[in-house]
Design a protein with these regions (language model features):
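N-terminal acidic leader/helix
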Residues: 7-40
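Compositionally biased, intrinsically disordered low-complexity segments
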Residues: 33-35, 55-58, 86, 93
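Short, flexible helical or helix-coil boundary motifs
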Residues: 1, 26, 30, 73-76, ...
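Short, charged, intrinsically disordered terminal tails
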Residues: 2-13, 79-94
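Amphipathic alpha-helical packing elements
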Residues: 40-84
Length: 94
């Protein structure tokens, strides 16, 4: 599979500079999908340490979730914090 050129990727990525920086500076991973009992979520982690965990709203698009993930990764990196919407939501549902 051919990768897009940097020029094409920059225009197609929607400005995901913090997601790019996360990949460039860590050996981390980003997962989008189910984190039971949460049907739709996004998780950015390095090893077993979550940096950002977001719950996708019922009407939120994947593009909107990725944009929120990008902003949250920027904040987490700048402030050296963990942003976790998932654990409070799991506790709320118990």
């Amino acid at each position: 599979m051919n990768k897009p050129s940097s020029k094409n990727a920059a225009s197609a990525d929607g400005g995901f500079e913090h997601i790019q920086a996360f990949f460039d500076t860590t050996r981390g991973q980003i997962t989008i999908g189910e984190i039971p009992p949460i049907r739709r979520a996004a998780l950015a982690a390095v090893g077993k340490k979550a940096r950002v965990a977001l719950v996708c709203g019922e009407t939120e698009s994947v593009a909107d979730l990725l944009q929120r993930l990008n902003v949250a990764l920027g904040k987490a990196a700048a402030e050296d914090i963990v942003i976790d919407e998932v654990l409070p939501e799991i506790k709320r549902r118990r």
